[in-house]
Amino acid sequence: MIEALYKFTKSHNQFHDRYDETKHKRIEIKFSTVMKANESVINRSNAIDQCKKANLGNRALSSDDMYNYNFDCNIQQVKRAEFDFLYYGLFFADKIAIFQMSSDEIQSCFGYSDKQHKGNEGEGQFHLNRKSIDYHMKNHFVQWLTYEELYNLLSNL
């Protein structure tokens, strides 16, 4: 999707996803599906009921509701030294939000932590959720893409 939208080419090595031949920049791509948080904490007495409810059909979140419901999308295994630009996004029920930030901007990204795993240096993560979505929309939002537009984009490859 990102390759087709922005005319990127295949990566030059295994450490990034695509390459921008025009700007000579390494591109990393990370996306997450947005689902409403569970209504209840899962425990022994409600585990079966929670499993029945834990499907995308019941928990898919529309973009119109991103400020109304709790959700948590983790953009992880972010290795800033391995790319120049990160394209990241959210698959909402009705459309896709696409964001972009430079590797230099990630260090100051709302909620970024460079300590994803014990002893794992140079790799971090950040969350997009009800508390942080406004930061991403104001500072890093690139575009909305409907699923029909995505279908047409991919059909024309």
For the regions a language model picked out, list residue spans one by one.
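Nucleic-acid endonuclease domains
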Residues: 1-16, 21-22, 31-157
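Short hydrophobic-acidic sequence motifs that mark active-site Asp/Glu residues
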Residues: 26-28
